[in-house]
């Protein structure tokens, strides 16, 4: 496997295996990792992860597990057995759920994926949180959940780049994975709390998830190269 030399993760947000692999075949595993989300995984099952690993990619399995502690821990174990590089769970599942996942991975003798917590989805603003009974700003809720994640022994968090400076200050050991990244001039789509790749890294993000600006580009390889050039300055 080619070791990835950048913090970039390209989201394979496609409905079919064929479409996802068509994009993957245009990308260099040395320049990016790839993310498999709910739609692609549901339509393609675990075979898509195996195929991407065989192509040399490190895979972020973005299924945001959220269930009772044992069920979630067993799902994380299954992901590890697939060979994924990163897997995530919802921090809102609570301390016991996250700790159960950490404990299950610690039993493994082989490589362990990075265990990442999802704080507040980047599409959510204060009024969205109020609608589910949380009368707080997104950043305040992120910090609450981050404290739980660190206590549970998580490796990092998914968060908006706008929350990254405060998170790095409060929890410097946590690795920050940031979606909602849009190169300069890109449309915002449905991601609200966004920054450019360079801005996100400067804010403290460790990994950057980029979707449509690369996946929907006329030349995805060229679009990826442009983002790499941007972050390398």
From Swiss-Prot:
Family matches, as InterPro entries: Aldolase_TIM, OMPdecase, OMPdecase_AS, OMPdecase_bac, OMPdeCOase_dom, RibuloseP-bd_barrel
GO biological process: 'de novo' pyrimidine nucleobase biosynthetic process; 'de novo' UMP biosynthetic process
EC number per UniProt: 4.1.1.23
Enzyme active site: 64
Coiled-coil ranges from the UniProt annotation: none
Keywords: Decarboxylase, Lyase, Pyrimidine biosynthesis
Enzyme class, spelled out: lyase
Classification via Gene3D superfamilies: Aldolase class I (3.20.20.70)
Cited PROSITE patterns: OMPDECASE (PS00156)
UniProt cross-references to CDD domains, sorted A to Z: OMP_decarboxylase_like (cd04725)
Function comment: Catalyzes the decarboxylation of orotidine 5'-monophosphate (OMP) to uridine 5'-monophosphate (UMP).
Subunit record text: Homodimer.
Identification of the protein by name: Orotidine 5'-phosphate decarboxylase
Organism for this UniProt entry: Pseudomonas putida (strain ATCC 47054 / DSM 6125 / CFBP 8728 / NCIMB 11950 / KT2440)
Gene name for this UniProt entry: pyrF
């Amino acid at each position: 496997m080619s070791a990835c030399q950048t913090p970039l993760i390209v989201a394979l947000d496609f409905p079919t295996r064929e479409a996802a692999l068509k994009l993957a075949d245009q990308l260099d595993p040395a320049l990016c990792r790839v993310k498999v989300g709910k739609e692609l995984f549901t339509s393609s099952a675990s075979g898509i992860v195996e195929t991407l690993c065989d192509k040399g990619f490190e895979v972020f399995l973005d299924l945001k597990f959220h269930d009772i502690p044992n069920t979630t821990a067993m799902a994380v174990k299954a992901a590890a057995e697939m060979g994924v590089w990163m897997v995530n769970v919802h921090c809102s599942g609570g301390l016991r759920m996250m700790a159960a996942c950490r404990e299950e991975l610690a039993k493994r003798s082989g490589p362990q994926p990075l265990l990442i917590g999802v704080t507040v989805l980047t599409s959510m603003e204060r009024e969205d949180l109020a609608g589910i009974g949380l009368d707080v700003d997104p950043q305040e809720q992120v910090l609450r959940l981050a404290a739980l994640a660190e206590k549970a022994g998580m490796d990092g968090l998914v968060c908006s780049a706008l929350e990254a400076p405060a998170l790095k200050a409060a929890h410097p050991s946590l690795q920050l994975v940031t979606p909602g990244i849009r190169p300069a001039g890109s449309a915002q789509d449905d991601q609200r709390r966004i920054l450019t790749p360079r801005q996100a890294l400067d804010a403290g993000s460790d990994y950057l998830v980029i979707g449509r600006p690369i996946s929907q580009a006329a030349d995805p390889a060229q679009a990826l190269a442009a983002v790499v050039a941007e972050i390398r300055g």
